[in-house]
């Protein structure tokens, strides 16, 4: 059985939804790939970073990014990110580029697993705590597959 998109119920509860266009500037992708290639071997395949930029109506511009150190805690069986480092970098970035703000995160994966979902939850909480400083009410999640499967770089926002 297949369901046509037009047959699905309207779940926007009467809200107007504008499409957002996302422009990823040229330095972002090499930064993410470099972060992936320089990660410690014991870290696994996952790298995480922060996306920064601007939003103007329906246009999101991702101008900057920075890597966020993380490690896998084997005892707690959880991914731990260096939140203190991330907060310091965000504060520094706001001084250097006051027009750019926090947009979300990047993660090296094809699809979100339990670690990716935990990171997404963390960034959602960060956005809730930084409502005055975040440019949008929800974090963008940019998934990058750095393995270049099929000789293509897969990026999903």
What is each PLM-predicted segment?
Residues 1-104, 108-157:
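N-terminal beta-strand/alpha-helix entry module and adjacent surface
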